[in-house]
Amino acid sequence: MLYKGDTLYLDWLEDGIAELVFDAPGSVNKLDTATVASLGEAIGVLEQQSDLKGLLLRSNKAAFIVGADITEFLSLFLVPEEQLSQWLHFANSVFNRLEDLPVPTIAAVNGYALGGGCECVLATDYRLATPDLRIGLPETKLGIMPGFGGSVRMPRMLGADSALEIIAAGKDVGADQALKIGLVDGVVKAEKLIEGAMAILRQAINGDLDWKAKRQPKLEPLKLSEIEATMSFTIAKGMVAQTAGKHYPAPITAVKTIEAAARFGREEALNLENKSFVPLAHTNEARALVGIFLNDQYVKGKAKKLTKDVETPKQAAVLGAGIMGGGIAYQSAWKGVPVVMKDINDKSLTLGMTEAAKLLNKQLERGKIDGLKLAGVISTIHPTLDYAGFDRVDVVVEAVVENPKVKKAVLAETEQKVRPDTVLASNTSTIPISELANALERPENFCGMHFFNPVHRMPLVEIIRGEKSSDETIAKVVAWASKMGKTPIVVNDCPGFFVNRVLFPYFAGFSQLLRDGADFRKIDKVMEKQFGWPMGPAYLLDVVGIDTAHHAQAVMAAGFPQRMQKDYRDAIDALFDANRFGQKNGLGFWRYKEDSKGKPKKEEDAVVDDLLAEVSQPKRDFSEEEIIARMMIPMVNEVVRCLEEGIIATPAEADMALVYGLGFPPFHGGAFRWLDTLGSAKYLDMAQQYQHLGPLYEVPEGLRNKARHNEPYYPPVEPARPVGDLKTA
């Protein structure tokens, strides 16, 4: 053994060839600060070996290196810029020394090589991969950019266009694509990986492969003519501006850095990468996006822990076909759980099957499946007008009309047709689960399962625990949702549960602004362009359906009369009374016409201004700051109440539910992350300016207490220990 660290070791293989093996405790390898330091020590040992002829890098895990240790990021981001820059220089010196070894090097890459893992193998001369490879640089999705030389080496290896596509979008690619663009040199079966890598290494040692020529382009300026450079970088900057926008500075910073570094050799180019990385790491956007990653891991880990002792349902059923039922049936079947889809008429069943077939055909068109797979999936969805097969199902989700009487009748009837241990769930969006449970003989086997539309796209499923829902019931439904590829978050019961309960105060803030003379077009523009929502409130209401919102608004008002009962006729009432239901009938705040792809395109409609004039004061202008404050305060206050009342368990789950269920702008990180970034004291000062607008603007007492001590909702993060304490030489 040449070297043994906590996460890697170095040993001789044969005839002057050494192997450097990543083998961290636990299930995966991460390139954390300790591993980088250990890698530097191992390379120091290699540099002393006069008889070294070649080096093989490999992993003892199912994945090569999954990336940097993101749990370290928030504390690293608090380190002063100078110290962070110093540590990055040290880390890059380690990879440079790996790249500069006077012998050929190869990485045998299995599974994932992401972020720092990808940057590590870019420093070797050759890369051989297995078919399950996923390799790339996802850093821009975390609000930063590659910091271990990825923005320098990848463009020089692949060419600017291929590298920009991966780096700016934070993409990873599979084995075939990686081979095609030159990111790996070959792909072999897993059992042949080491043998194949050794064969390449021997060829390089024997002079059959020119490893020095392979290495040289990574040390030099990027080979691009002035015209090629102008075209590549102009197109990349245009694409990034269009897709990422101003709220995500990392992608455009990465592109500009690669452009600026193109004319330099490795050392100067790495210095530019360092200078760009450090300021990005100190942005609120980076902290928010890293926070989302960590919250996502937490939520998924919680679901895994919850379901460790239950069997995932093997057969499911959906009550109520149509678009929603068809979407749920498709998602279940697509992920391998056969489903019976029941309705009371053929027309609805046809609609449900058509929806499932449409979604499968899209997969076929994209080349994700072939005709055989399509036929196989669709054959596991069984449409029926009766209860045939219900005696074999493990879980049933009801997705009929949003009417408590109808839902109770359907659920009570279904309970008589299934096994005593079958779990029933309701896809209601607002009706309390404990109220629906009153119709059942076995309420312990019942809970809520709130999907979001469109089912195949929206990652969140709210799992609602009723007063009598058993732990086993919740666990089974969480297991099914996870199997369907969704992110389940368990919440406690109340009208609207969590997501809709906090959404309708936001809509109420919108209605009050319109009542006071604001223009809905400006509100939408501000909430989209300035705050960052994917849709402004008017557009969102049109997509949700004005009729749906009108009904849900009444349910929420009955559930929370003190805050959500309004004493005036609002814009939603006016549009509903005029039969303007949104996209579903082509008339809402906007008029909708289908574009060439069959998607609804919004157009101005002057009739709306006349309708709104009946329920609004004369038009007046509002500042962007006031619009954002009046829209967000009711939502954030309600989010805080949900935490205080135990409707949602943690700030992390609340923020993920908002991001995954409502499209809360990820660069804000969710309501609690936004609140912490703003500061509770500053938020309280802002909210108090609007408390005269009514109970929705009254800040909960718990938040007032936080503000008095300026406490955050997330646990405070300590800066990483001074970088000088790490090995930096």
From Swiss-Prot:
Q: Give the residue ranges for region: Disordered.
A: 708-729
Q: What is its EC number?
A: 4.2.1.17, 5.1.2.3, 5.3.3.8, 1.1.1.35
Q: In which pathway does it act?
A: Lipid metabolism; fatty acid beta-oxidation
Q: Which GO terms describe its cellular component?
A: fatty acid beta-oxidation multienzyme complex
GO BP terms: namely: fatty acid beta-oxidation
Query: Sorted alphabetically, which InterPro entries does this protein's record hold?
Result: 3-OHacyl-CoA_DH_CS (IPR006180), 3-OHacyl-CoA_DH_NAD-bd (IPR006176), 3HC_DH_C (IPR006108), 6-PGluconate_DH-like_C_sf (IPR008927), ClpP/crotonase-like_dom_sf (IPR029045), Enoyl-CoA_hyd/isom_CS (IPR018376), Enoyl-CoA_hydra/iso (IPR001753), FA_oxidation_alpha_subunit (IPR050136)
- Provide the function of this protein: Involved in the aerobic and anaerobic degradation of long-chain fatty acids via beta-oxidation cycle. Catalyzes the formation of 3-oxoacyl-CoA from enoyl-CoA via L-3-hydroxyacyl-CoA. It can also use D-3-hydroxyacyl-CoA and cis-3-enoyl-CoA as substrate.
What is the recorded name of this protein?
Fatty acid oxidation complex subunit alpha
Which organism does this record belong to? Escherichia coli (strain SMS-3-5 / SECEC)
Gene of origin? fadB
